[in-house]
Design a protein with these regions (language model features):
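DNA breakage-rejoining catalytic core of tyrosine-based enzymes
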Residues: 7, 74, 117-120, 129-150, ...
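Short, polar N-cap/turn motifs at the start of nucleic acid-interacting alpha helices
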Residues: 180-187, 278-298
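Basic, Lys/Arg- and aromatic-enriched nucleic-acid-binding interface segment
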Residues: 95, 99, 114, 118-119, ...
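Active-site/catalytic core of tyrosine-dependent DNA strand-transfer enzymes
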Residues: 143, 193-196, 217-259
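Catalytic-site neighborhood detector that most strongly recognizes the C-terminal catalytic loop/helix
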Residues: 194, 223, 287-312
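C-terminal secondary-structure termini that scaffold catalytic or DNA-interacting sites
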Residues: 185, 194-213, 220-222, 240, ...
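N-terminal core-binding DNA-recognition domain of tyrosine site-specific recombinases/integrases
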Residues: 9-10, 43-119, 134, 242-248, ...
Length: 325
């Protein structure tokens, strides 16, 4: 809260009190350990970071504390962090797994800078090891997308169609109400999401500055499929009229037998943004990504994947010519 904190020392004699004061001031002069700073960051993060994100940070935070918990944060260097990341890489961790540990360290160090425990952030300059395996972004096949577009757009069937044509995350779509859908302006207002705490759905409304809060363009293909007339309530309610439980959602989705996940439809949407020539800066206003670096990275991945596919096709064509000759 910015106010000075008072600490009281007790002892059997004035000499013992002085000794305790000297020990305390000596420890204070050394600075806080990363574990102590992390406790403050976690308390703040619980108020500001989404529940699902915090859940994803739990194991990475444990790994960071195991490596650096007792280190004075002012003694932590970029080289220390890079050595930690290389050790993870040697264990066979994928790029995303290693990257999240760096993200956690970066957040802790940023917190330390704001509170005067650091003057610079050693995590910002740290680089990921080269050669890390990247988890492949699975784009749905044309057959899978055809199954989606052939669904009758009623009830829960509308969900995969909406995910494909808007790129909404599952939680965002599950929180949508008909009042959020403006057919005339061709806009869907995304202002909240459903988080699952175990099986229990919890609707979380975002602040105006939240990255996920956005207006998504209703494409002509989706406009044709959305029901006309005024409707109220959730687009995809559960049996009790409120948000679906996690179990209800899984059952409904499995019954569709699409053979793909909701998030794969988000990948398909982003791919179509790229193929349509939508600039990354504009695309992120539709996808809700929090920074342009992430959006550009996704675009680069799509381009590289398409280049690799083109190479395969050309090689197959060349080999066909060799067989003919």
């Amino acid at each position: 809260d910015g106010k000075p904190k008072r600490k009281t020392f007790y002892g059997a004699s004035p000499q013992e009190v002085r000794r305790k004061v000297l020990e305390f001031t000596g420890e204070q002069a050394k600075g806080k350990t990363l574990r102590e700073v992390c406790e403050g960051w976690q308390a703040e993060a619980e108020q500001e970071i989404r529940y699902n994100t915090l859940t994803c940070y739990k194991k990475p935070t444990e790994d960071v504390l195991e490596a650096f918990g007792d280190v004075r944060i002012r003694d932590l260097t970029t080289l220390d962090i890079e050595a930690f990341l290389r050790a993870l890489a040697k264990k066979g961790f994928a790029r995303q797994t290693v990257r999240v540990r760096l993200v956690v360290l970066n957040r802790i160090c940023k917190y330390a800078m704001r509170h005067g425990d650091l003057t610079s952030n050693p995590a910002e300059a740290a680089q990921l090891p080269k050669g890390l395996t990247a988890k492949k972004r699975e784009i749905p096949s044309n057959d899978a997308l055809a199954k989606v577009t052939e669904l009758e757009p009623k009830g829960f069937n509308l969900l995969p169609i909406l995910l494909y044509y808007t790129g909404c995350r599952r939680g965002e779509a599950m929180a949508l109400e008909w009042e959020d859908v403006d057919r005339n302006a061709r806009i869907i207002h995304v202002t909240k999401e459903v988080e699952y705490h175990g099986n229990v759905p919890v609707i979380v409304k975002w602040t105006k500055s939240a990255a996920g809060r956005r207006d998504i363009i209703i494409r002509s293909k989706l406009l044709e499929l959305l029901p006309k007339g005024k409707k109220k309530g959730l687009l995809f309610p559960g049996k009790d009229g409120g948000p679906m439980t996690k179990g209800e959602f899984i059952q409904w989705w499995d019954d569709l037998k699409l053979g793909i996940t909701p998030h794969q439809l988000r990948h398909a949407y982003v791919t179509e943004l790229y193929e349509a020539g939508v600039p990354a800066e504009v695309a992120m206003t539709q996808t809700g990504h929090s920074d342009i670096k992430t959006m550009r990275g996704i675009y680069t991945h799509i381009r590289d994947s398409q280049t690799a596919k083109a190479r395969e096709l050309l090689d197959a064509y060349d080999n066909k010519d060799v067989v003919k000759s």
